[in-house]
Swiss-Prot record:
It catalyses: Hydrolysis of DNA containing ring-opened 7-methylguanine residues, releasing 2,6-diamino-4-hydroxy-5-(N-methyl)formamidopyrimidine; 2'-deoxyribonucleotide-(2'-deoxyribose 5'-phosphate)-2'-deoxyribonucleotide-DNA = a 3'-end 2'-deoxyribonucleotide-(2,3-dehydro-2,3-deoxyribose 5'-phosphate)-DNA + a 5'-end 5'-phospho-2'-deoxyribonucleoside-DNA + H(+). The gene is mutM. GO terms for biological process: base-excision repair. Monomer. GO terms for molecular function: 8-oxo-7,8-dihydroguanine DNA N-glycosylase activity; class I DNA-(apurinic or apyrimidinic site) endonuclease activity; damaged DNA binding; zinc ion binding. DNA binds at H92, R111, K152. SUPFAM superfamilies: Glucocorticoid receptor-like (DNA-binding domain), N-terminal domain of MutM-like DNA repair proteins, S13-like H2TH domain. Its EC number is 3.2.2.23, 4.2.99.18. This is Formamidopyrimidine-DNA glycosylase. Keywords: DNA damage, DNA repair, DNA-binding, Glycosidase, Hydrolase, Lyase, Metal-binding, Multifunctional enzyme, Zinc, Zinc-finger.
Amino acid sequence: MPELPEVEIISNFLFDKIKNKQISGVTVNNWNLRVPITQNIDDVIKGKVINNIKRRGKYIIWHIDNDIVVTVHLGMSGKLIYAKGEQAQNKHDHVIFSFSDNTSIIFNDPRKFGLVIILNKEQEVNFFNDFGIEPFTDEFNGDYLQKLLKSKKVNIKSALMNNKLIVGIGNIYASESLFRARISPLRSAQDLTYKECEKLATEIKNTLSDAIIAGGSTLKDYAQPSGSVGYFQNSFYVYGKVQKPCKICNNTITLIRQNGRSTYFCNACQN
């Protein structure tokens, strides 16, 4: 699943390519994603102009004329593909947004876990009302993180992946951030010291920033709308490295399951 860095990259690309463009039409080839696509989507947004594009957590948000909000989530395998001119449609091209300059954005999702819905401004506020803090905000620091975690009895990795606490951090970046902070994913979130929270908040920001600079992590499905892939996977310390030597201490990387998810860490480096 694309996490914060990948969604940030896609949002920035779309901001550069389709902001201020007029939508000439929407073609829906498959209405039945995990949340059904808004039925009258073409009627609602055809002829309208995209005023802004932003990210909230792992969601891509298009602000359109008349307080219309197109909300997109890529699910497990979704992509937004930028195309010029007529394109042969592929099997999993579920939604095609066409623009007046003969370009288009194609929502392609083999596993159909993605989401494309229309909201108004009030619905947008309600939709994101219980989302947690954005990691790149100034407010997100050691003091904030310690206060956030002080009553959380779950393991720290699960806490980092809880969208109601902190948005955008999935399995990859939780594992990598914890390694950089030298904190074991087995630790109880509420037991972290202030210094550990300070270090963790810093390393979360550093890890996410480094991933964005590297174009994201391409393991299976992720690609930028241009078709370019990411390279941050080449910088992983622990994720996907089971039975391989730690880059820091040469100890073997361990794989366990936490809440049904794979967790990779170094027993020697992370305490």
